[in-house]
Design a protein with these regions (language model features):
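Extended, helix-rich architectural segments
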Residues: 1-105, 409-411
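Residues in well-ordered beta-strands of folded domains
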Residues: 79, 129-131, 246, 345-347, ...
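Extended, charged amphipathic alpha-helical segments
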Residues: 165-305
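Short amphipathic alpha-helical segments
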Residues: 44, 54-58, 62, 70, ...
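C-terminal helix-loop subdomains that flank or include functional centers
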Residues: 250, 269, 276-411
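Extended, regular secondary-structure scaffolds
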Residues: 67-190
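Short secondary-structure junctions and interdomain/linker hinges
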Residues: 26, 34, 55-63, 69-77, ...
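Alpha-helix boundary/N-cap detector
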Residues: 3-18, 22, 36, 40-43, ...
Length: 411
């Protein structure tokens, strides 16, 4: 009971959520460039982009969620499936709204999988076992289903909760594709196929340590503000918000009731420890220059190196997302009896920089060149160009700033 009270009264500073959201914001600040090739005019594609999972999420929103949860868990699995239909033609399928859709599974729902090396040396997913949970209304038992995929068939079973979880076969259908329509999306590749490495695993441990120290602070504040009253059992008294500690009757009769109150000097040490852990989290996430809420002593070189590391981290994540999305679109086209010949291009450079620091440097260069003997216009032109690069949001705006269109009156 006491542990539950401490959990309920302790705030949680969710650094994992903050960092995952920051990564997501940088990765999808500019939308990926998607060339769908031969399937770009298919009506199924337009419907899929507007509602990827048949629950209203657009494809961009779906991929953002995929990136968020792969950042947390290390990997997720995206399944591209198509509902069963008795339609005989493609026109009938379109009329019924039958098309491929996407579904995301986090690691706790991926029960088993197997990769096998083909004759060409490529590893191929040959078996997959997934757990699906169907939430029911209040007062009704939740239903659990198991879906198993092989290259030849797809099996669906219901978990019998009355018989120690024994699966009850429900249906078995032929796998029309001849392969398993699933793609593992990694945050970072690990040594084992199908298991990724989380971006925030160490950060989560540090955040838990911070939460424990916040709990200690809360307890110290509570005990300091509400001291305990020490009395014998016969004394009839109350201690307000504080506790009452009863002494045995055998104690010295000369003892009078007194207050027991701990010192609060250790709170400052705990707060300093929390601050040090937050700085460590920023270093681990390469965000010391982005998440700091106070001025920290960092040289210009250290700041630039921090941004380079963050840019490299985001670039690696972008490559993994691009590779996964290309594989997903191949499965989508295969469900429609086509071959994906398009191209997916995620941004690989994120141009993370401290504009204030860069402007200070350019200002010093301009002032120095102005006082130098024999200063030429070329130096000033370079400074002006760099200032335009800082002010422009993208390459198109930079081009317009460097090549302004003059009006007829100005010509």
């Amino acid at each position: 009971a006491e542990y539950g009270k401490r959990i309920a009264s302790t705030p949680y500073d969710n650094h994992v959520k903050s960092i995952a959201s920051t990564y997501n914001a940088f990765l999808y600040r500019n939308s990926p460039m998607r060339d769908f090739g031969s399937i770009k005019n298919r009506p199924e594609l337009e419907s899929f982009l507007e509602d990827a999972d048949l629950e209203g999420r657009t494809w961009d929103s779906f991929m953002r969620d995929v990136n968020t949860w792969s950042t947390v868990f290390g990997h997720v699995l995206v399944l591209i499936d198509k509902p069963k239909s008795n339609a005989g033609t493609r026109a009938e399928e379109l009329e019924q709204g039958i098309r491929p859709y996407a579904n995301m599974y986090t690691p706790e729902n991926i029960l088993d999988w197997e990769y096998r090396r083909t004759e060409s040396g490529k590893y191929e997913l040959v078996y997959l076992k997934l757990l699906e949970v169907e939430q029911r209304a209040y007062g009704q038992a939740t239903e659990y289903y198991i879906r198993e995929f092989t290259r030849d068939k797809i099996m669906l079973s219901r978990v019998n909760q009355d018989d120690h979880g024994k699966p009850i076969p429900m249906e078995e259908i032929v796998n029309e594709l001849g392969n398993i329509p699933a793609v593992f999306v990694y945050a970072n590749r690990g040594p084992v196929r199908g298991i990724g490495v989380s971006d925030v695993g160490d950060i989560a441990d540090m955040a838990m340590a911070i939460s424990n120290e916040w709990s200690e602070c809360e307890q110290l504040i509570r005990l300091t503000n509400h001291p305990s009253l020490v009395v014998t059992p016969e004394v009839d008294t109350t201690a307000g918000a504080g506790a009452i500690i009863k002494m045995p009757n055998e104690t010295d009769a000369g003892l009078k009731p007194y207050l027991l109150q701990p010192g609060g000097q250790s709170i400052d040490g705990i707060l300093k420890s929390i601050d040090d852990k937050i700085k460590a989290i920023d270093r681990m996430a390469h965000m010391s220059g982005l998440r700091s809420v106070e001025t920290r002593q960092m040289s210009g070189f250290a700041m630039s190196q921090e941004f380079i590391l963050l840019d490299s981290k985001l670039s690696e994540k972008s490559k993994n997302l691009q590779l996964a999305e290309e594989q997903i679109w191949r499965l989508f086209a295969q469900w429609m009896g086509d071959t994906f010949d398009g191209n997916i291009k995620y941004p690989m450079a994120f141009n993370i920089r401290d504009k204030n620091m860069d402007m200070d440097i350019l200002k010093k260069v301009a002032e120095t060149s102005a006082t130098m003997a024999g200063a030429d216009a070329q130096t000033q032109a370079i400074v002006n160009k760099k200032i335009m690069e800082l002010l422009a949001h993208d390459e198109e705006e930079l081009f317009e700033m460097m090549h302004p269109i003059t009006s007829p009156a100005q010509r």
